Design a protein with these regions (language model features):
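Short internal beta-strands
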Residues: 126-139
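Peripheral docking tails and interdomain loops at the edges
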Residues: 150-151, 159-230
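ATP-dependent carboxylate activation and anion-phosphoryl transfer catalytic cores
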Residues: 2-99
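Glycine- and Gly-Pro-enriched alpha-helical subdomains that act as flexible
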Residues: 95, 100-127
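Short acidic, glycine/serine/threonine-rich loops at helix termini
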Residues: 2, 10-14, 37, 60, ...
Length: 230
């Protein structure tokens, strides 16, 4: 079986409370599905799976993803709502989302229309937004308050100084044009070295907002699988 599918089985089993491996073995041994008394069951909680990457062991390597397999494992967060489940999944992967502080936002032109509501949500949650020139110009044009920071080639102080000095608590950076490749690569590598959570897609940024919102309003606490399935 594919390694991908083999990793899905235990995760799906934990979320559903059904031992898929055991039932699959029984079927291979000749048992019929009808005799297993399997019935649809409502799921009262949400599970979010997250991949674990070893980039922290290679701080000089750009953590950009490609077609090759780089994940060394997977973790999962379970909670009563998506936001908390996502927050737990990030925490389990070693990426603890902040509940306050400054967010560096620098996105491609195609993502600017999507980042505006995310920036507004972050401000409503108590965060301050820091953006590079193009992103800041767009956000300000939409009435979103943001601090402007220089890119690496635009002089000091710049975004590199803020990251190095740990003045940034969260990074939202989507891939942009070739002229920004050096900045993007630096941001990704520095975020790992300084243990700053970073998001490289709009979908991840939206999920992060939901996770932070849940963590601000509900205490993050562990629960056993037995409690979830009782």
């Amino acid at each position: 079986a594919s390694d991908v599918y083999k990793r899905q089985v235990p995760i799906v089993s934990k979320v559903t409370g059904i031992s898929l491996a055991r039932h699959a073995t029984e079927i291979m041994l000749g048992k019929k599905l009808k005799s297993m008394n399997l019935k649809p069951r409502p799921c009262r909680f949400i599970g979010v799976k997250e991949a674990v990457f070893p980039f922290n062991m290679f701080p000089e390597v750009d953590p950009v993803l490609g077609p090759e397999m780089r994940a060394t494992g997977e973790v999962m967060g379970i909670a009563d709502n998506f936001g908390m489940a996502y927050y737990k999944s990030q925490e389990a992967a070693g990426c603890i989302l902040p509940t306050s502080g400054k967010v560096l936002v620098t996105v491609s032109d195609r993502d600017k229309k999507f980042i505006e509501p995310i920036a507004r949500d972050l401000i409503s949650l108590g965060f301050k937004i820091v953006s590079t020139g193009g992103t800041a110009e767009y956000l300000r044009g939409q009435g979103v308050e943001t601090e402007v920071v220089n890119k690496l080639h635009e002089g000091r102080p710049n975004l590199g100084d803020m990251i190095t000095n740990k003045q940034i608590d969260l990074i939202i950076n989507t891939p942009v044009d070739r002229t920004s490749m050096i900045d993007d690569s630096f941001i990704r590598m520095q975020s790992i070295q300084k243990k700053i959570p970073y998001m490289t897609t709009i979908a991840a940024a939206r999920a992060t907002v939901e996770g932070i919102r849940s963590a601000q309003h509900v205490k993050v606490s562990p629960r056993s699988l037995q409690e979830y399935h009782s």
